Regions:
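A polyanion-binding, active-site-adjacent surface
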Residues: 2-204
Length: 206
């Protein structure tokens, strides 16, 4: 199974649509996913904004719609966009670090599986040449894209957002479970969210 999927991932797909179809048909992690594979992602070649989160939760696995949950509601509020804009693939691409629901662990969902990034992420990014801003939501996305440039904590990384601009903007995960973090770091919504909204507005309206 893994060998076959690795071969498929090595294929050069003529269009983004064919690549997305191949990703959605991927079964590389079948044996490790409690509810089976259902890759959830979306992208259009003209998108200027890329949203990179963790992995779909149970509700998103059920609906097949990314960020179709309370976390998504808060994220859209941060961005200052409604659902019509958020789900407009010509403006915003949504590619998590893990494309399928990974199941539950102690205290929350399991981490995103690494196979997705290994097999597909580089190809997907290469098919999105117009991306100007990538939102790195949570430490899995920040670890992958920022590497050693990350700070010691997520809060420090978010505070240092200007070091990663204009290409990246590191954000905490908007999950309701992170409410204590938001209360402890009230500067985030006061200082960083307005900057985020201004960038999103400028790019989404082009």
């Amino acid at each position: 199974m893994l060998i076959r999927q690795s071969t498929a991932a090595a294929t050069v797909y003529p269009t983004l649509e064919e690549l997305l179809a191949a990703v959605r048909a991927c079964r590389a992690c079948d044996a490790h996913l409690p509810l089976g594979p259902r890759p959830v992602l979306r992208a259009g070649a003209t998108a200027r904004i890329l949203v990179v989160g963790q992995a779909p939760g149970l509700r998103v696995h059920t609906t097949g719609i990314p960020w179709d949950d309370p976390s998504g509601e808060r994220l859209r509020a941060w961005m200052g966009v409604d659902k019509d804009v958020f789900y407009d693939e010509s403006r915003i691409a949504i590619i998590p670090m893990g494309y399928c629901y990974p199941g539950r662990g102690n205290g929350g969902d399991m981490p995103p599986r690494r196979e997705c990034a290994t097999l597909w992420l580089d190809q997907l990014l290469a098919r999105l040449p117009r991306i100007e801003l990538t939102l790195l939501i949570g430490h899995y996305a920040q670890r992958h894209f920022l590497g050693s440039r990350r700070k010691a904590s997520l809060a420090e990384t978010a505070r240092a957002w200007q070091e990663y601009a204009p290409q990246y903007m590191p954000l905490p995960h908007p999950s309701p479970r992170n409410q204590p973090w938001f209360k402890h770091h009230s500067w985030f919504e006061r200082q960083l969210v307005p900057v985020l909204r201004a960038r999103i507005n400028a790019l989404a309206e082009r």
